[in-house]
Amino acid sequence: MDTRLMDLLVCPLCKGPLAHDHATHELVCKADRLAFPIRDGIAVMLESQARSIDQPAAESAPADLSS
């Protein structure tokens, strides 16, 4: 993910800073304890697509709908 873009992105809920988790390919808001996925290099900043960081990444991974 482009570092210049990371400087501009904020949590869509609290407008707080996000941390890039390279291991899980997510942007993490520590204040809201949510992780937003990065898919094909694009951050999905929708609350409905975020997972609680209390929940393991594998549990909340959405099914691959591209067939």
From Swiss-Prot:
Entry-linked InterPro entries: Trm112-like
Pfam families for this protein: Trm112p (PF03966)
SUPFAM superfamilies: Trm112p-like
One Gene Ontology term, aspect cellular component: cytosol
Signal peptide start and end residues: none
Record-annotated disulphide pairs: none
Similarity annotation: Belongs to the UPF0434 family.
Protein name, entry field: UPF0434 protein Lcho_2556
